[in-house]
Amino acid sequence: MALRARALYDFRSENPGEISLREHEVLSLCSEQDIEGWLEGVNSRGDRGLFPASYVQVIRAPEPGPAGDGGPGAPARYANVPPGGFEPLPVAPPASFKPPPDAFQALLQPQQAPPPSTFQPPGAGFPYGGGALQPSPQQLYGGYQASQGSDDDWDDEWDDSSTVADEPGALGSGAYPDLDGSSSAGVGAAGRYRLSTRSDLSLGSRGGSVPPQHHPSGPKSSATVSRNLNRFSTFVKSGGEAFVLGEASGFVKDGDKLCVVLGPYGPEWQENPYPFQCTIDDPTKQTKFKGMKSYISYKLVPTHTQVPVHRRYKHFDWLYARLAEKFPVISVPHLPEKQATGRFEEDFISKRRKGLIWWMNHMASHPVLAQCDVFQHFLTCPSSTDEKAWKQGKRKAEKDEMVGANFFLTLSTPPAAALDLQEVESKIDGFKCFTKKMDDSALQLNHTANEFARKQVTGFKKEYQKVGQSFRGLSQAFELDQQAFSVGLNQAIAFTGDAYDAIGELFAEQPRQDLDPVMDLLALYQGHLANFPDIIHVQKGKAWPLEQVIWSVLCRLKGATLTAVPLWVSESYSTGEEASRDVDAWVFSLECKLDCSTGSFLLEYLALGNEYSFSKVQRVPLMTVLSF
């Protein structure tokens, strides 16, 4: 029979390639083998794509009856040797099995799954029971390990003949980690759905990892994890999830702290005490290796050092990648577009230089980005004369520990009243609507201005020149009449024709005076607007993980089925700032107790000495009813 599964929860797709599920919906699976917690299948509406494996329960065929029941195995009961021998007979693959799409074939080639056997371990009734071995991410994705690169690699990379910079690669391992951060080949499917290190410790399993307790009798208990199932979401990749789960650790130096102050219009970054500007001049074509490699070099002169440095576009691209990785909640404007052909043409060089000037003006005026070490290294280190210092600064930036989850440790917020989460969420939603509307409006204005500028350069100029040409033709006609009294009239008509030609040229030059700067500024803003959806996703993600942690911990207790989903803690601990700061200690000291009289859980977090701000034992009742 075809592989089928039943949806245990509603799931709304957020990314391309995913499909939405409805609770109790029956789906057709393309393969029972999951890839990093995701299965591929077709829902009841005919949509094919990926969905979380823990959101569904595989519908398995009933086991064949024993030989004594008169089933197919009855004749073998009286034989000395079973017909199939003592080894279990392999079961043929289901008839409706379809190979995964091409995108997954390459991933599955390193290790092919063996055909299913008639033997099933005791936990096989559950989708992830039985502890079937799953291929490790290294095997599944080819085991590619990204290298940090040596000094020779650095020379090869930055001496490429193309001015189009390589796409920034991911640091560290190229394999996708498991949900619990492990990537060993022997970890089973159940082991890859651990709650988290902190939550496991909070339940008393400090000696090692404890897989979730799955209970086939309660389907709801099979799919609750504390982590975001979409491991490719911005909230996960930026380190926001790891931070709110208390997995960020690192020593923050005073120079690395980013201070937020209360300004006249609300919270804002602390201003740069030493503002500066930077000019970009003299784009020149340079060659090396006896002309075999060519590139465009720009001269940068920051006002606070007055020392010129020369940078290629690939250097700008490298800087952008480092800043975007280090500051997940700060919008780093996009660089001017790349171009593979015609990059040495005068018009393209001039246009790119103007775009880099806009980009540099914004970066130098930003209170946080302008003071960043990697940005200052980019502006002040003369790579052509001190190559060793340049490489040291590059390696330091690429090995920066204050990235990802640790970045949030560097934020220093002012002492203020507790934030109302509902008000915070309302403001974020309002800003989200504003950015969406502004993005659409900026795109429309850019299109309209570009079309109008094109008409001025071509259409208007051509039309005025036609009128001027007509007047000059009339003047030439009058010149055929050699009467003395018509000389002044002929000159006036010719002057009118020349005036129309000049007006046409003015129309062609006008966009450079007004519309081109507006469109350049719009391009910068469009880069910001493209960044805001990911930043908003990170901001909104920090508002709910505390509730999700509580929910996940409770679901782990004795396989209990929680029938009431709404959870919230008391107002004293519902502020985003307080939760983000103390969630690590809170989860470590978490104790859950069952109140038999009311059938509800009471959550208790204990004071751990003077290290944390808990002055006494506090009990937070959760509005959750348990059914066993």
UniProtKB/Swiss-Prot annotation:
- Provide the BAR domain boundaries: 421-628
Q: Which PROSITE patterns match?
A: PX (PS50195), SH3 (PS50002)
Q: Which domain of life is it from?
A: Eukaryota
Return the Pro residues bias intervals: 90-102
Q: Where is the composition biased (Polar residues)?
A: 135-149
Q: Which Pfam families match?
A: BAR_3_WASP_bdg, PX, SH3_9
Annotated region Disordered: where? Answer: 62-188, 200-224
**Can you say where in the cell this protein is located?**
Endomembrane system; Endosome membrane; Recycling endosome membrane; Cell membrane
Domain PX, chain residue ranges per copy? 276-386
Provide the Gene Ontology terms for cellular component. Answer: cytoplasmic side of plasma membrane; cytoplasmic vesicle; extracellular exosome; plasma membrane; recycling endosome membrane
User: Binding residues for a 1,2-diacyl-sn-glycero-3-phospho-(1D-myo-inositol-4,5-bisphosphate), per the UniProt record?
Assistant: R312, K314, R352
Q: Which GO terms describe its molecular function?
A: phosphatidylinositol binding; phosphatidylinositol-4,5-bisphosphate binding
- InterPro entries in UniProt: AH/BAR_dom_sf, PX_dom, PX_dom_sf, SH3-like_dom_sf, SH3_domain, SNX18_PX, SNX18_SH3, Snx9_fam
Q: Which GO biological process entries does UniProt record here?
A: cleavage furrow formation; endocytosis; endosomal transport; mitotic cytokinesis; plasma membrane tubulation; positive regulation of autophagosome assembly; positive regulation of GTPase activity; protein transport
Keywords (A to Z) from UniProt: Cell cycle, Cell division, Cell membrane, Cytoplasmic vesicle, Endocytosis, Endosome, Lipid-binding, Membrane, Mitosis, Protein transport, SH3 domain, Transport
Domain commentary: The PX domain mediates interaction with membranes enriched in phosphatidylinositol 4,5-bisphosphate.
| Family indicated by similarity | Belongs to the sorting nexin family.
| Quaternary context | Heterodimer with SNX9. Interacts with ITCH. Interacts with dynamin-2 (DNM2), SYNJ1 and WASL. Interacts with the AP-1 complex. Interacts with FCHSD1 (via the F-BAR domain).
Q: Any idea what this protein is called?
A: Sorting nexin-18
What species was this sequence derived from? Homo sapiens (Human)
The gene behind this protein is: SNX18
